[in-house]
Structures are given as structure tokens and as C-alpha cells.
Amino acid sequence: LILFDEAQLSDEQSVRGLYFDSIVRRALKYFSDAKFVFAHPFIENPEAQLQKNGIETIDTTATYSNYELKNVGQIFYTHDSTSQKFYHFGSDSATLGKRKLEANFDPIESALKKGGSVLIYVPKSHIYSKQVYIQFQKYISMCQPIDNPIAIKMIDELKEYIGASTTDKSFYNSDMLEKLRCGIVVHHGSMPLTARLILEHFTQQGFCKICFATSTLEQGINMPFDVVYLDRFEESKTLSVKNLIGRAGRSTNKPVFDFGSVILRPNAMSRFRKVYREKNTLSSKSRLDTTDDKIDEKYEEYKEAIKTGEFSDEYNLTNKDLEKLKSDNVTTVVPTLLDMMFSDAGFVLPNTVAKEVYEDFQCLYKQYLGRELTAAEKFVFDSAIKIRIWKMHGKTFSKICQERYAYVSNVAQRRLLSQAGQQDRADSLTVRYIAGYNDIPDKELRTYPLFPAETKGKDVDYDRIVYDTYDFLDKLIGFKLSDLFYAIFHQYYLAYQDDRAERLAKYIKYGTEDSTEIWMLRYGFSFEEIEWLKPCVESIDQTEIK
């Protein structure tokens, strides 16, 4: 049985939709006897999932159903931020009337006073700029510090994981953790997965009072709230809106009438009514089969390889790419790179890696792309390679975040000046350049720093470093570069039997060369889990764990 949850992702107008359908088709090819289940909320034509991937022709017994169920009802409000008044309005003007009626209370304040929780849906940029903390200060001030030992333990776990300090405002200070101590949660797609799981558990345990969240929460696990406030309304994303509304209210076993509250801006009222009534349908044509996508040519090659069966599941690359990565232009660079990456004692230390190493990695990536890198792509790529080298040396996520923060915010120099009694000079030091995460390849990418040049070192947001580091590790290194460089070095090892190439290939892909740890990683265990589980493992391979 293979379950594809949130299967509406196949319709996303981004490479995510492309990758989703490619996984479906590869699974159909290799697991033809398996039962495939697709689950998507609010979709009127679930049969489109069968049509776009040819499942109806493969299996004529395939069935589908559309369940129109609602777990709990909602009351709708609009909030006039100028007058600070709330108004009731009907989701269906034909049935409930077109007029809004003033509410004589604040539903957010009321929920918080009763010990309830509030989800506020905002743009990620407003979280990064801290605008949300000013905009919703009235409600934040109602949230007092939490003294529950279970909650404090979870906060301390998160603090240790990201490597933050909460005692020194000048170094490694996490504003996110300070807010969390008062039950204020921040949840978005650049939050490390481990951190997200802690925060979701924190919320489920009832410790969350206010949650500022982006669209990542749409497909999150069960995290209901008493009030959902849509500070951001995206009319084009009807499924997103309906998913978020669905988080308002929870059904309980208590003898009370269960319902949730949904709040919008006045200018979103009519658009919301339209979205609320709109039927959601999937396209019956896969993005793999469209020909007018405006995407990088590498993705066009990927689409063609999936459709023609010219895709290697061993390396997660097209056969065309694999041939390219065995060319003389690649194999002449690899031994030079291995010489620089290894010393007699093993891997060279990260701080002794020569700039030629970055140039050689760039050269290999250039051969893969079949073109020169733009200046902006080079900055992003070099940052990714530096982080990858740190990982190869066993640096934890927290240590990598601390290293990047120390560099960009001039920690060493600021501390020296501060200890010398020159606090004003320490406070006036500005940041050093560091490239922020961006998806590459992207020929249109512009060069920009993670922090503007005039930013003071003492004002560098440690949380922003955490989010950016995770984006590099998850979206670029883990999702793209690891497969590419694993293929380069593993193929070189097979051709020339250079053990260093095999070691480097394993470290690039898995972060270890230990075969037991590699198998455990492939089974889905994290390094944190492997640390205590490994002694319990007698044997492990592709068939079983003993």
C-alpha cells in the first residue's frame, strides 16, 4: 500500500508539482502490484489523479469518492483595524444577508482569556521583519511566561537543537525562543523539521496561545485552534484558504457546542465568500506532459527522462546527466579535488579548505548544467558547499548555525572590543557578506546578501541564520546537490577504484561512511536516533533490521 497524502500538490505551478507526479509514475513502474491511495481535501474531481497518470488504463478497478464532510462549524468575523471593531458576517450572503453586524466583543481576546489558542496566518516576510509582533502587540502582551515543566523541557530541547542563547542579547540570541516561553509559536517552511515537530507537539499539548504561521501549516498535522485570523488572504489559493479555515475549532467529548471562529480583513470579505463557495478541481493533465512550462532547461530534461524511462533511480538523475558526469571534463577535475579534500589524516579541516576546492566543485556543477554559473548562482553555490563540508566533518545543525552567525556578525572582533572596554566600537561593527539561500539553477537570480551591508553585527537575527541554514541543507543540498555529487564521485570510484572517491561520495550523500548508519538513514532514522539505536542493531540490509 502506498499512500500519497496531500495529493493536490501535483497541481502546484512549481517544480514541486513536477516532482510529485514523477514519484507517482516511478512508483507505478516499480511497484505495479501495490495499491495506490491518493488523499486530497476539498477536491471535486479526485478521478483526475487517475487520469493524469494513466492509472485508469492500467487498472480498470480503480475507484474514487468525494466526501463532503465538516467536522465542526465556524462563525465568521471581519476585523476593522482602524476602529479596532469586529463584525459578524455570513459566508453565504444569499442565505445569511449581505450586511455585517457589529460584535460587542473581541473574539481573539475572548479566546485567550478562556485559555484558548489563536492561529494568525501571515506572510513569511512579516515574521522575518518582526512586523507581526508590532501589529499584534495587544494580544502578545496578554501571554504570560509559561512555568509548566513539560513546556519548559520542550523549549530547552529546541534551544539546544538550534544552538541559541537566551541569556546574552548580544550573541546567539533567539527572539523565537523568547516568544515561545510565553506560548507564542512561529511556524513556517524554513523552520527546521525537528523544530517544527517540537512546536507542533508543544501546540497539541495546549501550551500555544498564539501561532504566527505561513502556508506550511496548511498541510500540517492535526493542530486545531479556537480562532483562525487570516491576516493574509490569497484568493488564488482556494485550497489553502479552505485548509486554514478547517483549523478553526475542534470537536470534543464535552457536553458543549463546539465551533471555531474565523477572522478576515474587511477588504477580503466578498473575495472570501467567492472562494468559500468555489469548487476545487484538479487538472487531468500532468505537468510532466505540458509543453509550455517556463522553467529552467534542466527541468525540461528531467520531464523528458521520466516520460521516456531514461531516469536512474540509483542516482536520482537522468541517464543523460550520468553520461555527462563521466566525461573527461569531469574525470580530470575529480582527482585534483580529492587531493585537496584529503590529507594523510583524513578529510582536511573546514577552515583549511582552499578556494580552489570551491572552484573545482563549481566546475563540476557547471558541467552538469552545461553552462556557466551566474555571479548570483556562484555565491549561493559556494555557501552550500561550505555547509556541506561542515556536515562532512560531523558538525551538528546547531554548530553550523553558530559558525555562520559568528562569521556574519563579527562575533570574535566584537567580543575583543567589548573586553577591551570599547563597547561603542563593538556595537558599531557592521556585518560581513553572506549569501542567503535561493533555489538554483536560476539564470535570473540577482545577487543579494542575507543581511544588508549597513546592518550592525549586534543586530543580526540569529533565528534568520537558523532558517537560512535549514533552507540550504534541506532544499538545495539534500534535495539537489547531494545526489549530483554522489553520482560524480561514486561513478569515478567504480571506474578508477579510488577509495577516497567512494568515501567522499558516502559522506556527501549520507554524512557518514559507516554501512550500518547508512542503512539506518535509508530506513528513515535521524542521526540523533541512530546515536542510541545503533547498539541495538545486530544486522541491517534492504530486507530487514535485526
Predicted regions located by residue number:
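Conserved C-terminal RecA-like helicase domain
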Residues: 1, 102-210, 225, 233-241, ...
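Long, hydrophobic alpha-helical segments
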Residues: 267-326
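SF2 helicase catalytic motif II
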Residues: 1-32
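Structural recognition of the conserved hydrophobic beta-strand(s) that form the central parallel beta-sheet
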Residues: 3, 34-41, 210-213
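C-terminal accessory/interaction regions of large nucleic acid-associated machines
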Residues: 235, 303-546
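Conserved segment of the helicase C-terminal RecA-like domain
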Residues: 33, 238-281
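Conserved interdomain linker/interface between the two RecA-like ATPase lobes of SF2 helicase motors
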Residues: 37-144
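A short beta-strand element within the Helicase C-terminal
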Residues: 2, 210-233, 260-263
